Amino acid sequence: MAHGAMGTTATDTNMNTKTMPTEPTTTVAFDPGTFERLHRAYRRIDPGDPAQAWHLLEALHVLGQTRLVPHARTHGLMLALAWRTRNLAEVNGQLLRLLLVPLGHLLGRLPLGNTGRSHVGAFRPMQVAPELLATIRAHQRPPTL
């Protein structure tokens, strides 16, 4: 395991780099099923409701940011939404973040809990907002008995 200023890096059996928190930042454990259910919910969003689309993408980012592929995939979706909504500041922010994702995973320096949007510092760890946590939990599969 390598240690970075914002977390500890390890590799799981799927060869996905993951970062585990070492600071008091609230994080959400990655679950591929929950990630895919959130992604499906995002794809079903009404194109005329960008606020809900951004909310789901922020939830996807918080959930997937400790894994390289889901993290990059989420920033790609954010870039596409920024382009569709003609938000040039967000387009530029997402282009920068897409370049930083591999480097952050390689160095194990990911700002856990960060929502991934351009109006938030790219290196700023954050507490997970209660509404994002509620959205993530709503898409978790209930335990089977």
Give residue ranges: language-model regions.
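TPR repeat positional signature
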Residues: 37-38, 71, 75-78
